[in-house]
Amino acid sequence: MRLIIAEKHSVGQAIAQALGGHAERHDGYIEVGDDLVTWAQGHLVDLAAPDEYQGHDWGRWSLDTLPIDPTPDWQWKVGREKGARTGSTRSSRGLMRRDDTDSLVNACDPDREGEAIFRRIVAHAGVSQADATPCGSRALEEDAIRAAFESMR
């Protein structure tokens, strides 16, 4: 199955509708044929705060601890903003780990922020980003969405 990750709920719904066919709605995603469509809610995943890293004294600000560089052990966590701790996080993570999920599509906005949102969600789930395909469409019209997905094949 192909997992499509959109940046917002409204975009996920528009994609599911454009894909056509019978759509089954679940908590945090829509299944349409061989496609699973899920969505973020803005910045679902952010870097952990310095004081959340074990083995470092980064909790108190001090010149002695600068620069703070967690490389290579970046830690990701679900964001604190309202609504971030919902089914979207659980479902996108679970959907990426399903045995029948064989490809990822980045349907977030084709800009820096959209790319960051997508990559952070995938990193938080602990799956490979190597085979992710960008959708590259900002439009919400069915014809434009269909054309974008057809050009990926």
What label would you give each PLM region?
Residues M1-R153:
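Intrinsically disordered, low-complexity regulatory segments
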